[in-house]
């Protein structure tokens, strides 16, 4: 009985809508004069009846869903709003707002917002899709897409814009052909041209980088700013493979990458014959090289290395080093380098084995002090000689 009454009420509502409010002519529908209010159950079942799609409303309230030509102030739906042209004001739905034209104001939905152009804010639980220009902000739980945006894109997974001027923030990845401002992602940023800052948890990639790249790996064809990372692959930049020896480790391998003015250094060293044991190091540093003449560079470096004896990783031994030297070009792709270094070794004294090994490894000391019950620091001046391949 209850179900039968519901069916009768819906049918009556539809009939009244069609007869009382569906009398406008085609000419008047095309002109789309605004009505103060639309009430809808679902699209075409409401106060505008079969003329809903060609009628513009200042306010539209839709129990499940509704369709309008334009909205001039506000639209609310439990599930779905459909607008054939423009929305000016506020649009909210539980699932989706599908607007084909301009959105000026605020769009919010549980899953999806769409627009052709945007001036204001799009907020969605899953996705925001803007076909052309966006001026304002797009915020979504998963993805934000816009042909161009001046403002901010924030998403949990992925942001895309052919042109972005402002800020792209993503939980996973950002992509822009031409980016001005900031790209920040936990995994990867990709831009053809970036004028500003790229910050990524793993990889930054750009054809042309004007500004700063900060990530584990930075990749660019050309960089007119700086790249800060463990590995910086700049096609027109600075790449050197270095074999060297110093007072602690007679065999060291390092990869220097980035730009001459600022590059990263990843290094490893080994001393297999140390007291019938194996001593080795792994380190990271930053360096800068300045031309003194066409064939001579001045090198300045700061580095940190972890020292391990006989694979005892639990012993915390840190070597901090400042190096100043010169790099002399020999012939194509080959140079030699030598210089002096100031060294500070902070090593563990919590067990006798490590304490004795580190005391024997350090060649001599200028300063030696106890930091606490478990740490000791020793300092000395050392040197390095190297051959480098560009």
Residues of each region from the PLM?
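Predominantly the C-terminal beta-signal and adjacent terminal strand-loop region
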Residues: 221-223, 260-261, 322, 327-390
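Solvent-exposed loop/turn segments connecting transmembrane beta-strands
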Residues: 67-70, 84-85, 100, 115, ...
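Bacterial Sec-dependent N-terminal signal peptides
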Residues: 1-27
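Residue-level detector of the transmembrane beta-barrel scaffold of outer-membrane proteins
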Residues: 60, 75, 89-91, 107, ...
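Residues that define the transmembrane beta-barrel architecture of outer-membrane proteins
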Residues: 55-57, 70, 117, 148, ...
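Repeated loop/turn-to-beta-strand initiation elements of outer-membrane beta-barrel proteins
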Residues: 102-103, 118-119, 133-135, 149-150, ...
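Residues on the lipid-exposed face of transmembrane beta-strands in outer-membrane beta-barrel proteins
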Residues: 61-63, 214-216, 230, 251-257, ...
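Transmembrane beta-strands of outer-membrane beta-barrel pores
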Residues: 45, 63-67, 80-82, 96-98, ...
């Amino acid at each position: 009985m209850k179900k039968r009454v519901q069916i009768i009420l819906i049918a009556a509502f539809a009939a009244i809508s069609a007869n009382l409010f569906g009398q406008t002519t085609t000419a008047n529908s095309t002109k789309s004069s605004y009505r103060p209010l639309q009430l809808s159950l679902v699209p075409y079942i409401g106060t505008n009846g079969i003329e809903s799609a060609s009628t513009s409303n200042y306010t539209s309230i839709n129990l499940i869903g509704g369709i309008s030509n334009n909205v001039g102030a506000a639209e609310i739906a439990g599930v779905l709003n459909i607008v054939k042209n423009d929305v000016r004001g506020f649009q909210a739905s539980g699932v989706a707002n599908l607007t084909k034209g301009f959105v000026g104001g605020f769009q919010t939905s549980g899953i999806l917002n769409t627009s052709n152009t945007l001036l204001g804010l799009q907020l969605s639980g899953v996705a925001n899709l803007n076909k052309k220009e966006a001026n304002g902000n797009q915020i979504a739980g998963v993805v934000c897409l816009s042909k161009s945006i001046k403002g901010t894109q924030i998403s949990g997974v992925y942001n895309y814009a052919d042109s972005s001027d402002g800020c792209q923030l993503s939980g996973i990845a950002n992509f822009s052909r031409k980016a001005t401002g900031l790209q920040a992602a936990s995994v990867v940023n990709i831009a053809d041209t970036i004028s500003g800052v790229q910050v990524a948890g793993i990889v930054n990639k750009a054809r042309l980088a004007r500004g700063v790249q900060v990530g584990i790996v930075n990749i660019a064809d050309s960089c007119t700013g700086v790249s800060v990372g463990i590995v910086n692959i700049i096609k027109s930049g600075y790449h050197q493979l270095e074999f060297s020896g110093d007072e602690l480790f007679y065999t060291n391998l390092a990869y220097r990458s980035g730009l001459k003015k600022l590059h990263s250094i990843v290094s490893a060293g080994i001393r297999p014959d140390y007291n019938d044991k194996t001593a080795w190091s792994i380190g990271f540093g930053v360096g800068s090289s300045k031309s003194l003449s066409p064939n001579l560079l001045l090198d300045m470096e700061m580095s940190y290395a972890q020292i391990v004896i006989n694979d005892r990783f639990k012993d915390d031994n840190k070597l901090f080093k400042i190096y100043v030297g010169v790099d002399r070009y020999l012939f194509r792709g080959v140079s030699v380098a030598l210089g002096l270094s100031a060294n500070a070794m902070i090593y563990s004294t919590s067990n006798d084995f490590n304490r004795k090994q580190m005391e024997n490894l350090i060649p001599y000391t200028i300063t030696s002090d106890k930091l606490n019950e478990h740490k000791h620091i020793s300092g000395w001046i050392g040197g390095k000689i190297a051959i480098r391949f560009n």
